[in-house]
Amino acid sequence: MSIPKLSRRQFLALSAATAGVAALGSRFVPLPQTITPAGAAEPSLSEGQWIPTCCHMCGGTSGILCNVVNGRVAKIKPNTDNPIGLANVSSDYWQHKSEGAAMCPKGNAGIFTLYDPDRVKKPLKRTNPEKGKGVDPKWKEISWDEALDEIAAKLKALRDNGEAHTLLWFTEDSSFTDIQADFCDLYGTPNYSMHSNLCDVSRKAIFKSVMGHDRPLGDTVNSKYILFFGWNPLSATKWSHLPRTITRGIENGARFIVVDPYCSFTASKAHEWIPIKPSTDGAMALAMANVIIESKLYDQKFVDDWAVGFDQFSAYVKDKTPEWAEKITGVPADTIRRIAREFATTKPAIVDAWSGPGQHSNAVQGGRAIAVLAALTGNVDKPGTIMIPNKGGGAHPPIRVKKTDKPRLDGLSKFPMGHSSGVYTEIISRILDGKGPYQPKMAVVMFQNLVLSIPGTNNVIEALKKLDYVVVDDIYLSETAEMADIVLPGSTYLERYEVIGQWVTWPVVSLRQPVVPPIFGQLPEYDVVIQLGKRLGLKDADGAPFFESLKYEDYISKMIQGGSAKITLEELKALPGAVWMDPKGTQYEKHLAEVKPPEGATVDPKTGSVKDKDGKLVGVKVGDKVHKGFATPTGKLEFFSESLASKKDINGNPIDGLPAYTPRDWYPDDKFPLFLINWKESHHTHSRTFNNPYLMEIQNWNRLAINDVTAGKLGIQDGDEIWVESPYGKAKAIARVTQGIHPEVVGWQHGFGHWGFGKVAKGKGTADGQFNVTKSDPISGMALHKEVCVKVYKA
Amino acid sequence: MKPASTKRTDSSDKANLLRKALVTHVVRNVACDNHEIEAARGEKAIVALARANIYNLLASAYAEPPSLQVVRAIADGTLLRAFRDVGLDHVAAELDAFVPGRDAKDLLEEMEIEYTRLFVAPGPDYVPPYQSMYSDELSDGSTALANDGKRLDKRQLWGDSAVAAERMYLEAGLAVTGELREVPDHIGLELQFLQHLCGREAEALNTGRILAAEESVRLQLAFLETQLAPWIDRFCQAVGNAARHPFYRGIANLTLGFVLSDVEELRRQASVIVDGAMGSGDVCSV
Ligand code: SF4
């Protein structure tokens, strides 16, 4: 590089020669006279301000305080005014609040995400029409107005052409969802989908069908026996209070058992780790029920009063002996017998299951078998058991809209326990096979890396290629953004609002608020939606423009006012820690609340269900009292689900009303002899935290865990480069030889293997989704991240 | 620039601390009667304005995608000549070879893509246009290694350099606009800040406010020395290496050459001011 030395004469010549070539409008404004320069900088200089808000490095929303010094976030610490991060039942929270709360590594590393140099800073437009993995989109910066005008024009053209329903909308599921749903309704597409079906909708279906609530939470602090199937809460934190509430439970005397093919961090802290073959947890649970019933260790009175279908269930499990289960699960019959006895005789006890058993084609029935163990032993909604939370939250602001009558592309309604988040795998499959009711044309993807998160990576890439126009809003140039026509710079949680009202057992409303303005002047996602709605002139059912003068602050203020707090946004901001909570705290055994049935109500003699004259369930008669009951169709806990039994799964197969065990569809065979599973740890969320050096410092590679005996047979040593191969993909990995995994199983941490995203994330580890088939479980629509078999050999 | 006159001397024997203020006070009051000084001041103002223009030109090259005017200035030879004038003949030659027969719109899109690849969209050739990515410490001081044994680059946006830059903007009575917000140590903002200061200097000189002009020069030098100069070298080298398009190679060369020359010139001027005011007693050296 030659560096010219310029004289003053040349300054003049250069200035004259280039006059008019470029003129940058001023990016500065004079400070108001009233603020002296010193005054403008000084007050925030030393200690700055502490602003309460909520973390969103994962979906857990732990309460945090942000120290903003000189307009920059300097420090983040836990906010003890917010129970999320400290406790999930109120007595524990109030008693231990002064001890402080916790943040996980991701929460602690949040500042880097805000200031990550690899963030998307300006709207980008693709100029290379060719799309594909690793194909340079040849981005060109465009202004926000150009970007929004172009997207709005595409949307308008689609709508004017009567094709509004061909718009697909994907979003993360714990941020700015309501306003996006409103947009889709007003625009006229039924295809609004959220992340949940990649996460835990099978668990939602399980608990909804058994106990009428889709996200019960364990009161572990007060428990004496904690039994988890396939869950790693001590490391895969979502809500940073999880580890504390469990270890406190252990300190308080709980025995802690973890059933999992992998000796997760959680299993390593348990009294006992029980290795099991993936997807067979339901069989073990049925055998436990067999022992508990045969030995008369179940809670007869509770079952009589509060459950339906017990007789059918006990008849069904009669031959589901521990020996029967041993053959399926690989867990010794004696172990099953012992765990069953311990569980049934130690009170209070918690049994819970998450994504381990939840991401296979038999997830819902297997999970129901686990959930009914709580009903069998009367461990429901009591201190120290699995709890039905009282959600506080915000209410969706009222909107009058006539929804489109076009069907969804994913056929969600055909999933008997499908979740409102839709079915991503079906969307991808329909785009590819063209067998849907129509071909979608356009997609808006908010804060989602579909390519690395939907099973069957290549299918996702091919599907995205088939769409005419793809908009991605993200803070990184993710592998999905690589497929976009326009990328909008997303906001981080430290730059935007959210109302939070779940994750603990009593009504608590907390606020996420911008602690600094969006650092590149970008629009937060909700404002993008508002701007698009405005440009399209979307109107509600009464013909009133909905987005025209809408401010997101007003929108969420209405949400807060409509929820249990009944206060405004400003009032919430003013509360300590920006948190409102119900002083009544956690309520147990809410099903016992007595209700007065309306005139003309009738009682079902078999179940005790009390229905009003329109057939709506209004309570449950137990003895001579009518109680509120559970939110199931019968008002009771359901060993047998009449409603499920009346339906067919997505493949047209009838569903058993009992939690019957069937093996999952895809089992290891000679060609692909090993189960492949995946998991998460405290230092990463989904696939989205992998450009954070503070987190990559903890773990920057997902080596494939393989049992030492299996490795020995295959001639693989720790640290060897190996091939992992399934019918759908083949890639290199590095072996981690360990005794901490079932011999028939290999597994690794999810989220690695980026080829885009950012310089820190890129090229680290192996992406797991490429080995999978693009399928969901046939009842809930849960993506099958763990139903995959592989062979492994030395590279 | 050489001081306009070195003939007159100040015979008074006041304390050095008071001298500078007094001198400028005298100059301010007598200047309008003195054609020589006025002419010198006028010339200084012209130079300051020229510098403001160049800072604006450079700022615009980094702060926003290229415009059609830039493409035209390439096509019609304006920029070629400008590069030649400052001794960047090889850049001019490259640019010359690049242009002929090209459609202006194609050329514009090509340059927009190049601009975005270099300064906006993180990727293999991204040259982050933020001072913190050059001036700040590579790591947080932790000795922890990632589990591949490597130290990770933990530099982040809005580091100490950004805070320091913003502080100087505020001290100068300027704030980054909310509408076109950027992180304060973006190269475009730092260059444009200097444009503002040079503009102020010119305006002060033109309205006879010598103290204000001097204050602006002092700020320019301080900002250049503490903010822009320490990283401009590495930044421009990186752009020079990553740029595929001769325009951005040329701009990088020009930026580095101009900024370093300007610092040198300002230093020389400052030493003259200090000498004149505090030492030799040369009243007209301003
Ligand atoms: S669990 Fe960690 S990342 Fe998730 S919200 Fe809590 S502190 Fe943040």
Regions found by a protein language model. Name each.
Chain A
Residues 162-166, 298-303, 350, 381-388, ...:
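Flexible, glycine/charged-enriched surface loops at secondary-structure junctions
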Residues 135, 229-231, 269-270, 319-324, ...:
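Flexible glycine/proline-enriched surface loops and loop-helix/loop-strand junctions
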Residues 217, 494-518, 528-529, 533-538, ...:
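Glycine/threonine-rich phosphate-binding loop and adjacent beta-strand/alpha-helix elements that clamp
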Residues 288, 307-424:
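Active-site phosphate/pyrophosphate-binding segments
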Residues 122, 126-146, 297-333, 515-619, ...:
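N-terminal leader/propeptide and maturation segments of large enzyme subunits in energy/redox metabolism
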Residues 2, 180-246, 252-259, 266, ...:
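Extended redox/cofactor-interaction regions of prokaryotic respiratory oxidoreductases
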Residues 2-295, 319, 332, 531, ...:
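N-terminal export/assembly segments and adjacent metallocofactor-ligating motifs
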Residues 524-578, 687-705, 709-795:
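Long, contiguous, secondary-structure-rich segments that constitute the structural scaffold
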